[in-house]
């Protein structure tokens, strides 16, 4: 399988029996928005496919439950920080459930790893990769000037001269980032450097270091907005401690816009995932994300939502048609697949998750199924139905062409047809409502 690596700017092969993956989780001070769902569904799609190929995946994700934004939200709502994090962690977990996400093997709130964070930062100081200034600890960028900026293709001097960083007198270099913040605001923790809180950029580096025992992981994923400075700073800390890359492949997905505009509170177009899922089926969002190469920007609008609805409706309509065929005809269903369809699916997925080509394959297969069902060519029909359902399931979509008909459903459908032929329309209408609820009409 090939995936595009942000660091080397080329596709890299990944052919292993065990694959280790890390993805940055949310800061739980608010509901996540639908843009945050893109990397979640991207990794879910990748992991589901890898596991369908018999590959073991170890998937780790963090939860940032210590942050200035959490403190500010607690003050705004006159609540404790724990009340804020409990509320939004619960909402996030419900979002994952509603999206039918394959849960990470480990989902770790960073507040559970303070002592480990303390030791990690202490190691950086001992290696002279970080320095302590009156209880504030900063990473020393200049010690790694040959490496820093490679992931985001940025040069240190350009960043400084462009006035894009805040100048602090206590830092050796204005780009030096905080790995331990001295503060008395909000919940604080004891450390070798005094009371304070760990820096955001150090969380992920620590978890990868600990969970994967200092080894380079296979895939690190996240949105393009995290590429700099967050991922750049993660990478440099791991290099400082171990002298090697934190990840073999960096997978970054593109930005998401709503009706051509970036989501922002000032424009009033921010859509939380909770609100989206209250109005639309989770398959709608999955289908939308599958339409576009994951590295490209994606614009969500009413037309795209309508296209997703039409795709789902095609599946549902065909499912009804197939159920009726099963009731009215005697034949033995095959459990086999159309080998060419499955082959093409795997080719597209292994080519840097080319899901837009997979959707084209699904559309073509739906046309074939519709044609074969009309012709009643049952052997080929069910080869294609089985293949379609396999792909839909592997992509994490909950829709499928239902090929199971119970005796009750069969008897009810035949009774309905008999009553219609007898023109007892009132009774037929009652049965029709039941058949609609069962997905037969």
Curated annotation (Swiss-Prot):
E.C. designation(s): 6.1.1.16
GO terms, molecular function: ATP binding; cysteine-tRNA ligase activity; zinc ion binding
List of residues binding ATP: 265
Binding of Zn(2+), residues: 24, 204, 230, 234
Motif ('KMSKS' region): 262-266
UniProt keywords, alphabetically: Aminoacyl-tRNA synthetase, ATP-binding, Cytoplasm, Ligase, Metal-binding, Nucleotide-binding, Protein biosynthesis, Zinc
HAMAP family per record: Cys_tRNA_synth
Protein name per Swiss-Prot or TrEMBL: Cysteine--tRNA ligase
Gene (UniProt): cysS
């Amino acid at each position: 399988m090939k995936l595009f690596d942000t660091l080397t700017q080329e596709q890299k092969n990944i052919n292993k029996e065990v694959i280790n993956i890390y993805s940055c989780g949310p800061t739980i001070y608010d509901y996540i928005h639908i843009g945050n769902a893109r990397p979640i569904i991207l990794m879910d799609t990748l992991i589901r496919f890898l596991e369908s190929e018999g590959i073991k995946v170890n998937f780790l994700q963090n939860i940032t439950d210590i942050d200035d934004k959490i403190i500010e939200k607690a003050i705004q709502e006159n609540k404790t920080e724990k009340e804020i994090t409990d509320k939004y962690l619960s909402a996030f977990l419900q979002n994952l459930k509603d999206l039918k996400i394959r849960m990470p093997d480990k989902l770790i709130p960073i507040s559970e790893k303070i002592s480990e964070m303390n030791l990690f930062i202490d190691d950086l100081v001992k290696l002279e990769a970080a320095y302590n200034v009156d209880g504030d600890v900063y990473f020393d960028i200049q010690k790694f000037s040959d490496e820093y900026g490679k992931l985001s293709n940025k040069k240190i001097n350009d960043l400084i001269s462009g006035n894009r960083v805040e100048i602090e007198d206590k830092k050796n270099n204005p780009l030096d980032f905080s790995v331990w913040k001295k503060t008395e605001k909000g919940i604080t923790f004891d450390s070798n450097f005094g009371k304070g809180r760990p820096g955001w950029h150090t969380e992920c580096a620590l978890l990868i270091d600990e969970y994967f025992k200092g080894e380079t992981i296979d895939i690190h994923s996240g949105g393009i907005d995290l590429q700099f400075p967050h991922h750049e700073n993660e990478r440099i800390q791991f290099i400082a401690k171990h002298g090697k890359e934190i990840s073999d492949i960096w997978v970054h997905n593109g930005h998401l816009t709503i009706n051509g505009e970036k989501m922002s509170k000032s424009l009033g177009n921010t859509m939380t995932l909770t609100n989206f899922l209250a109005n639309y089926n989770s398959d709608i969002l999955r289908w939308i994300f599958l339409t576009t190469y994951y590295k490209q920007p994606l614009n969500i609008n009413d037309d795209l939502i309508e296209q997703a609805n039409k795709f789902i409706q095609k599946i549902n309509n065909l499912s009804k048609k197939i159920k009726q065929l099963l009731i009215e005809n005697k034949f033995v269903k095959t459990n086999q697949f159309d080998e060419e369809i499955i082959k093409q699916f795997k080719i597209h997925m292994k080519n840097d998750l080319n899901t837009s080509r997979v959707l084209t394959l699904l559309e073509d297969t739906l046309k074939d199924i519709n044609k074969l069902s009309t012709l009643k060519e049952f052997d080929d029909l069910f080869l294609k139905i089985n293949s379609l359902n396999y792909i839909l399931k592997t992509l994490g979509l909950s829709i499928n062409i239902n090929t199971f008909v119970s005796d009750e459903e069969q008897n009810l459908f035949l009774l309905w047809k008999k009553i219609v032929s007898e023109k007892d329309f009132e009774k037929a209408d009652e049965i029709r409502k039941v058949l609609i609820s069962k997905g037969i009409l």
